[in-house]
Amino acid sequence: MEGTSESPILDEFEANSNDYDNEFISRFSQNPLHAFSLFTNGNIQEYFMNNSLEKIIIHIVLIIISLCGIKAQTSKIIYIVRLLFWKMYNVINNLVNKMINREKIADRQIVDNRFREFEERFRILLLQHDENIAKQDNIVQYNKLDNFAESIKSEFNLKVAEMERRFQELKWRCDMIANKTMNTIVLTNTVDSTNKDEKIIFDEGSVVQYNRE
């Protein structure tokens, strides 16, 4: 069983990438127990520092398989372990992608909510602006109507004042005519009364003179 292009992730797990790995494979291929000599020469710290976690796990799995008495080719065992890690990688990657997708969905929902909130605020702002414009238009119309009413009121007051002035003038003329008429009547009555007194009252001298004649 060999690697294919369908599993490119397997190429990242190269077992023969450093001296420690090559030495481990060579000793393990001769005798699995010889691999333990790498850990008895005081190089265990350097071994763990120079090998990745995947390779260390592969080496441990190979040692366990060999100690259990299962004899198989090293390359096939390594490939099987690679497949196992590839499967684990896919599972973990799928889980990570699901979590990322959930976060993206959550972020998208947050963005949608923010956008809807902004849209609602913008709509309310437009309504308020329209209401303000309508109020201003109403105020302008009211001011125009009020000015028109004030002009009519002023004109009416002027007409009333003019009518009152004419009425006062007419009243004054009527009073003048009435006074003249009354004066004429009084004078006439006075003259008539004087004439009547002259006819009724006779002077004694005049009477004596009349008798003589």
Curated annotation (Swiss-Prot):
GO terms for molecular function: channel activity; toxin activity. Its main location: host cell. InterPro entries: Rotavirus_NSP4 (IPR002107). It is a single-pass type III membrane protein. The chain crosses the membrane at residues 52-74. GO terms for biological process: monoatomic ion transmembrane transport; symbiont-mediated activation of host autophagy; viral process. Homotetramer. Interacts with the immature particle in the viroplasm. Interacts with host CAV1, early and late in infection. Interacts with host integrin ITGA1/ITGB1 heterodimer. Interacts with host integrin ITGA2/ITGB1 heterodimer. Interaction with microtubules blocks trafficking to the Golgi apparatus. This is Non-structural glycoprotein 4.
